[in-house]
Curated annotation (Swiss-Prot):
The keyword Transcription does not apply. It is an enzyme of class 5 (isomerase). Belongs to the cyclophilin-type PPIase family. PPIase D subfamily. TPR repeats lie at residues 213-246, 264-297, 302-335. Its EC number is 5.2.1.8. PPIases accelerate the folding of proteins. It catalyzes the cis-trans isomerization of proline imidic peptide bonds in oligopeptides. It comes from Yarrowia lipolytica (strain CLIB 122 / E 150). The keyword RNA-binding does not apply. This is Peptidyl-prolyl cis-trans isomerase D. Residues 7-171 form the PPIase cyclophilin-type domain. The lineage of its organism: Eukaryota, Fungi, Dikarya, Ascomycota, Saccharomycotina. One of its GO terms (biological process) is protein folding. CDD domains: cyclophilin_ABH_like. It is found in: Cytoplasm.
């Protein structure tokens, strides 16, 4: 038999980020797979309380990095509800697969034989869940989407601070071609959004990892030279994500130096591109990351201070802007761009003071 395939279209904070595609193991756990499939299509109508038996519009209510993302509670939305197509709960069907890899679909439960509609997607190996939770499917495509969910900021009870919503879902036609891996977007970037999810990068080989990061950086530079600052920013950010995920403890001194150099360079490039596309907060964060690297040289430090100061200036925070810009000028006293920026910020601060003076003078001017 051919196993059914389904999809989720996901939004974070109201912005659609893409689709996740799944294969359901109907050949091994047909009852569990059918429950999930029907909840994707919504074909079974409503619960007794009149709530649609449908994942559409429901959320991922629990997210734990390096563990799993959980959803499927379309009745309460907080992990206390949900219902299967067979009634409120149904028994554990079988345990044919271990939780031995990321991107498996497994049933959430409150103990033995309490399956409803809640599910989770693993983001790493979770062997402690074996023979307790029914694995009934796997992800076919959309690793980057799951990783974005996994990395969304959470608050109490591991609940995402921004809603992570299944805005659409359904079953795929038999002839639908699911995109495999990360499809080249036309720039030469055929890498997944997160380092450890790549089949074409050996995370145990520094040359393979650093080669991928260098390629992403060069793609970003090419896009920048072509006038595509927004596209360049995406590639530089992707390179920094790879660098943040790459923390082996057995690197040679030569490779450690390469990692530091790449990290500083990529953060500086992110800061520059972010300023060009009017994302000053991104620029400030990236420049700060460059400054935090203990190997940053004075020339790069001056660039980072200049770009962070420019970010503060864009946010009309002239105090912090001048602090950074003056520090940059101390390192590069002959740099005309820094001098010009300092003068520009001083003038902006003066105009602000004069405007405020004029505004408040009216409160005490008589009539």
């Amino acid at each position: 038999m051919t196993n059914p395939r389904v999809f989720f279209e996901v939004a974070i904070g109201g912005k659609t980020i893409g689709k996740i595609y799944f294969e359901l193991f109907a050949d091994k756990v047909p009852k569990t797979a059918e429950n999930f499939r029907a909840l994707c299509t919504g074909e079974k109508g409503n619960t007794q309380a009149g709530i649609p038996l449908h994942f559409k519009g429901s959320s991922f209510h629990r997210v734990i990095k390096d563990f799993m993302v959980q959803g499927g509670d379309f009745t309460a939305g907080n992990g206390t509800g949900g219902e299967s197509i067979y009634g409120e709960k149904f028994p554990d069907e079988a345990f044919p697969y271990p939780h031995d890899q990321p991107f498996l679909l497994s049933m959430a439960n409150a103990g033995p034989n309490t399956n409803g509609s809640q599910f989770f997607i693993t983001t790493t190996e979770t062997p402690h869940l074996d023979n307790k939770h029914v694995v009934f499917g796997k992800l076919l495509s959309g690793k980057g989407i799951v990783r974005q969910i996994e990395r969304t900021e959470t608050g109490e009870q591991d609940r995402p601070k921004q809603p992570v919503t299944i805005v659409d879902c359904g079953e795929l036609p038999a002839d639908f071609q699911v995109p495999v891996g990360n499809v080249d977007d036309g720039t030469g970037d055929d890498y997944e959004d997160f380092l450890k999810d790549n089949d074409n990068v050996d995370v145990n080989d520094p040359a393979s990892v650093l080669g991928a990061i260098e390629k992403l950086k060069s793609i970003g530079t090419k896009l920048f030279k072509e006038g595509n600052a927004e596209g360049a920013l995406k590639k530089y950010l992707k390179a920094t994500t790879y660098l943040e995920d790459y923390l082996p403890d057995d690197l040679s001194e030569e490779n450690i130096a390469k990692v530091h150099a790449l990290r500083i360079s990529c953060y500086l490039n992110v800061a520059l591109m972010a300023l060009k596309v009017n994302q000053p907060k991104v620029a400030i964060k990236a420049a700060t990351s460059a400054l935090d690297d203990e190997t940053v040289a004075n020339k790069e430090k001056a660039k980072a201070l200049f770009r962070r100061g420019s970010g503060y200036a864009a946010l009309k925070n002239e105090t912090d802007a001048l602090k950074d810009l003056n520090a940059a000028l101390e390192l590069e006293p002959a740099d005309g761009a820094i001098k010009n920026k300092i003068e520009e910020v001083k003038q902006a601060a003066q105009r602000r003071r004069e405007a405020e003076k004029k505004k408040y003078a009216g409160f005490f001017g008589g009539k």
